[in-house]
């Protein structure tokens, strides 16, 4: 599943319960911290961008290759395989979300901030669900849904949604002189 657009996912494994007994709070904290870190930094390994994830010890995820940088060894060594990827379906799925992001941008421009915020949350949830369904399918990381997610991430649509969310919220909360 590598291409010139690929990135390297660096998973930092933490025992959330050793940080705080409220593991949902710990997860929310680490999710926010990693999103901020990923937004601010552009670290690469051989020109592939590194994306940080923080996961709870024992958390399961599917991957064709897992390498421990701590132990300098493969945990799951990737096997090169010929995989048929449905790029046409992935492009269609991603284009639908590109179109939705543009409509949301128009809502923000038109001052319809509350409506924009509701749409943003729904679209982000649908994107998460789409990827989850894809990763849990037989095709897993090669599914059209996961490839569509990667297209959206590569094309900065996920960032655009987050930026629109901040813009809509800030505009909604701003008090203007009359």
Identify the function of each model-found stretch:
Residues 1-6, 13-178:
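Catalytic core of pol beta-like nucleotidyltransferases
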């Amino acid at each position: 599943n590598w291409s010139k657009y690929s990135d390297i996912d660096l998973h930092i494994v933490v025992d959330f319960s050793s940080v705080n007994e409220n593991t949902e709070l710990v997860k929310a904290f680490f999710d926010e911290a990693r999103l901020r870190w990923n937004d601010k930094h552009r670290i690469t390994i051989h020109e592939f961008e590194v994306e940080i994830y923080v996961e709870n010890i024992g958390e399961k995820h599917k991957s064709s290759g897992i390498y421990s940088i701590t132990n300098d060894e493969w945990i799951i060594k990737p096997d090169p395989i010929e995989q048929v990827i449905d790029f046409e379906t992935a492009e269609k799925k991603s284009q639908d979300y590109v179109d939705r992001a543009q409509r949301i941008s128009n809502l923000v421009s038109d001052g319809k901030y509350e409506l924009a915020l509701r749409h943003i949350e729904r679209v982000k949830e649908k994107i998460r669900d789409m990827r989850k369904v894809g990763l849990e399918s037989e095709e897993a990381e090669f599914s059209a849904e996961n490839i569509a997610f990667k297209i959206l991430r590569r094309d900065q649509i996920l960032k655009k949604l987050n930026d629109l969310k901040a813009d809509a919220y800030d505009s909604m909360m701003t008090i203007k002189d009359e």
